[in-house]
């Protein structure tokens, strides 16, 4: 198996197992304050380091507490990953906040606002484009 494929496979397994551990394995209450989703996992070529990108739904204070809880549980996660994946040496786990979903939501909101403005301007323009009716009088010259 090519080294790149192995790294991808290990990353996919880490993502799956970490998701499972987030639901059933971690007892730290800080982790369960917000809705946590794993968005991506990057594993170094030597399988010694692992970056887990998470999206956390909630207020900024909740996000920071959840991230602290995840970092505190990283040793536990590393041990569990080593045991579950039967790796001689499990990678060091680091969590990173992924703000991609937030940014995407922000862009969608902006597009929606633009669409509403366009509709409003379209209504104003269509009213101004109405032909003005003038009364015409005909004068008979006799």
Curated annotation (Swiss-Prot):
Intracellular or extracellular location(s): Cytoplasm
PROSITE patterns named among the record's database cross-references: RBFA
Coiled coil: none
A GO molecular-function annotation: ribosomal small subunit binding
Biased composition (Polar residues): 123-142
UniProt keywords, alphabetically: Cytoplasm, Ribosome biogenesis
Gene Ontology cellular component terms for the protein in this record: cytosol
Region (Disordered): 120-142
Top-level taxon in the UniProt lineage: Bacteria
Entries under InterPro entries matching the protein: KH_dom-like_a/b, RbfA, RbfA_dom_sf, Ribosome-bd_factorA_CS
BP GO annotations: maturation of SSU-rRNA
SUBUNIT field: Monomer. Binds 30S ribosomal subunits, but not 50S ribosomal subunits or 70S ribosomes.
Function (record text): One of several proteins that assist in the late maturation steps of the functional core of the 30S ribosomal subunit. Associates with free 30S ribosomal subunits (but not with 30S subunits that are part of 70S ribosomes or polysomes). Required for efficient processing of 16S rRNA. May interact with the 5'-terminal helix region of 16S rRNA.
Family annotation (PANTHER family): RIBOSOME-BINDING FACTOR A, CHLOROPLASTIC-RELATED
Family recorded in the similarity comment: Belongs to the RbfA family.
Descriptive protein name: Ribosome-binding factor A
Organism placement in taxonomy: Bacteria, Bacillati, Cyanobacteriota, Cyanophyceae, Synechococcales
């Amino acid at each position: 198996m090519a080294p790149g494929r192995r790294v991808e496979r290990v990353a996919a397994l880490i993502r799956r197992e970490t998701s499972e551990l987030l639901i059933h394995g971690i007892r730290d209450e800080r982790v369960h304050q917000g809705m946590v989703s794993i968005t991506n996992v990057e594993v170094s070529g030597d399988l010694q380091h692992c970056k887990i990108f998470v999206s956390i739904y909630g207020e900024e204070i909740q996000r920071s507490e959840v991230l602290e809880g995840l970092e505190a549980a990283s040793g536990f996660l590393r041990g569990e990953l080593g045991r579950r994946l039967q790796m001689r040496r499990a990678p060091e786990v680091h969590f990173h906040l992924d703000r991609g979903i937030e940014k995407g939501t922000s862009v969608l909101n902006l597009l929606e606002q633009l669409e509403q403005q366009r509709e409003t301007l379209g209504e104003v323009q269509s009213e101004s484009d109405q032909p003005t009716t003038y009364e015409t009088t005909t004068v008979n010259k006799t």
